Amino acid sequence: MANSSSQHMVCGSVTFRDVAVDFSQEEWACLDATQKVLYRNIMLETYSNLVAVVGRCIPKPDLIVLLEPEKEPWMAVKKETGRPSQGLETGFEAENRSPKNHVYNKKLPKQTIQQLSKTSDVQGVSVSNGPGYSVIKEPQNYQEGDANRNITNKKEMSTYTSKTLAHNKEKPYKCKDCGKCFGCKSNLHQHESIHTGEKPYECKDCGKTFRLPQMLSRHQKSHSDERPFECNICGKSFHLPTLLQYHKNIHTGLKPFECEECGKSFKSFNRISTLFQHRTIHAGMKPYKCNVCGKAFNRRSNLLQHQKIHSEDRPFHCKVCGKAFTVLAQLTRHENIHTEDKSFECKQCGKIFSNGSYLLRHYDTHTNEKPFECNICGKAFRLHLYLSEHQKTHTDEKPFKCKLCESAFRRKYQLSEHQRIHTDGKPYQCKDCWEFFRRRSNFIEHQSIHTGKKPFECKDCGKVFRLNIHLIRHQRFHSDEKPFECKECGKAFHFSSQLNNHKTSHTGQTPFECKECGKSFKRVSSLVEHRIIHSGVKPYKCNACGRAFNRRSNLMQHEKIHSDERPFECKDCGKAFTVLAQLTRHQTIHNGKKSYECEQCGSAFRLPYQLTQHQRIHYDVKPFQCKECGRAFVRSTGLRIHERIHTGEKPFQCKECGEAFQYHYQFLGHFRIHTGKNPYECSECGKYFTYGRDLKVHQSIHNLEKP
């Protein structure tokens, strides 16, 4: 019973104008017909809910009077403050200011009194404190007639509405493009900038331009360190009071506004527009379309953020590492890496987070609530997105279709990877290698590969680089600066990416799982590269032999086979290698260590992959089969070498005489004819041989001669 009465008191302090969303005439004109219908439904539903709380009919606010006959909501007269006229205050609001229903002379929790003192504009009241509660005393000059003075009957409402319509006709300034009228010439000028695209107000710090001066003022606060609005719970400060209010909802966890479609709830009265925007997801509305790539969004803010992908504008720079971002929120999240600021604590388990959204996501692990259930197999999910993704496994539905070749895919990322073949959405093409790029900045950076220009030189060692970011990274190796330290073992790193990779060695976690095969990875970049295997896309092709690869790194490693460059030399035997990993594997021959032992037969191996391949012999596993003749192999390399018999491919060509070979060892043996090098020496007689097998045959002669 006590809970019910406290709930009634909270409702009693809420007015319709606290929860109503207002549109100006200009803003209302930007909505399409579907959005206007959705807005009307939400406002009428909100008013009905308030009437249900009171339990009887109350005089209607002016906004509802206009919405019911489907008139324009901006016709409601407002004062300069943007609030409805005092004469149109709702009966609900006035009723709850009467001594019978108001909070005066009632015992309330102290927390409620503190909240009321912040939001109420009632003056002349006194508060008396008791054990666990407080009482607001009625002001001496308060009279019951004052509460009912603002109630408006239907006759007054009708008179007022007709005056409102007459007032709106007095708008002499008309827009030549769309015909809208304005009562003030300055409002017309501001409106015309929408059609012209003119943005005369420029930020002196980053050069960004805006249509209106208030937009510029709001933006400039992001450059200054001034954050006057501080959270009294965690101490975090903000540029704007609205940001502080949104932030406080994270600590309270209040989400009173619930979506009837999916049950998702939203935080506060001030953010009812979030519910309004969320409902457009269920309605399937995506009115905001990108002019560059055609992608559509249900929110204008999402479109604006997306459009920055196509531009080169990254005005927000990290002062610690120099990394640049398109959005201020991305920079703010990134800065938490350097500061390790974790202000958001879970009250259930004490775990702390650097971002409020991470804390909200973490809350779901305690509730274990999975409201979205699959009607086919009964599996439940936390988010509707996960359910939609799961349901695709039960059907053959492939909704993501390629417009150029009619290939269809179950998931969006598969289509994106496939579209690389057609170079869709990459307007910048390199004339030297025909590679396509989405951004002009990436295209310019790529061209320096062909020109060989390396304008950025290191003052310490003289090494030159193509890009400035490469120079900045390199210079950290000369300095002892390692700002990213592991809290577990104290090891420090030059880059945050190195620290993140290192942290997985302590946890052993592989959180990024492939939905196709179930394989998991430590890093999301590894998962992205792995997904290309399932899509079958091999966009990186060797110009020398035509072989294709699904990773650029594999192509670069392969191209070293065609060149004579072997920079990694073994100090024990002088053998040289194209890749450092090959040298590392080779050096295990000299140290003699065979750490990986087979449990079946006791055979020991130097490298783990050798043990894995050996174990296939015991299980008679040969997963790599030739499509031409059906022959199977233990290793993929064995299959690739075998396929050259069918294709006739000879990738190893001698630059001296032009002769080509199928196998690398044949090419090396032939190349020694031109160089005159015979690296295999007999320890008995000192004779040299071109091939290792010739040395073995020769040594058998000495073995026969020995008694």
From Swiss-Prot:
Residue ranges occupied by any KRAB domain in the UniProt entry: 14-86
Zinc finger (C2H2-type): 173-195, 201-223, 229-251, 257-282, 288-310, 316-338, 344-366, 372-394, 400-422, 428-450, 456-478, 484-506, 512-534, 540-562, 568-590, 596-618, 624-646, 652-674, 680-702
Primary localization class, coarse: nucleus
Subcellular location: Nucleus
SUPFAM superfamilies in alphabetical order: beta-beta-alpha zinc fingers, KRAB domain (Kruppel-associated box)
Alphabetical keyword list: DNA-binding, Metal-binding, Nucleus, Repeat, Zinc, Zinc-finger
CDD domains per the UniProt record, alphabetical: KRAB_A-box
Family recorded in the similarity comment: Belongs to the krueppel C2H2-type zinc-finger protein family.
The protein's name: Zinc finger protein 60
Organism field: Mus musculus
